[in-house]
Amino acid sequence: MQAQGIRAPRTKGGITMIDVTRPELDDAITRAWQASPEGSAAAVYTPDIERVLQGLCANRFEAHYCADAAEARAYLNGKIDGKKVGIGDSETLRKLELHEALAAHNQVHNVLRSPINKGTTFFEYAKGTLLTDVFLCSVNALTEDGILVNMDGTGNRVAAALFGHEKVYYVAGVNKICPDLDHAIWRLRNIAAPRNCLRKHKATPCAKRGDRCYNCASPERICNGLLIEFKKMSNMDMEVVLVGECLGL
């Protein structure tokens, strides 16, 4: 059943989008990008959303565009029903309030929100996200030609995103879009990682100074592993839900 208040998506060349016009799309993306920390720089980079969606489809991902967080929440809440759902650590998903929406009609396994039984370690509990029907997370960056890039410290998020589910959903705001792979990796190290270290109160140079990556050797470093998904993984459905506003870090 279609969620109330959401327009029926249209499909074009394998891309599904809420029924918006190109001028509406361009205006939304420009406003969202300029409102983001990256977009506040003197030279404003405006991503080509149609190229991103086409690139994702060319790389075998399903691609869906939603104008804002409310539409994205309603879309995902309508798609995922009666499933065992794993949710990775994500400021984007917190902003969408997906845990609350999905928990009403799914069994949600959230490493940050679900209660952990006494005597169960985080390692043991986090392994549970590998065994769910559906897994949701965000991306640290994605390129205009549809490549997904993530960096992880513990590895549970990227491990869960790679294998073992019926479907994985990546949810990303337009602030995560980068022109190419070099810029995407730069964003991971100099924007996403310092902000996440600061959020998690890590004792790392990037968190203390808040400006860039220092390629440190701190035991609390969170950029230990880099995952680049050039194409969709085999034997599992993967969908990228792109949201036309600034979300996450």
Positions of PLM-derived features:
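Flexible, glycine/proline-enriched loop segments at strand-loop-helix junctions
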Residues: 39-40, 62, 113-116, 168-175
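Short N-terminal helix-initiation segments at or just after the protein's N-terminus
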Residues: 23-32, 110-118, 186, 246-248
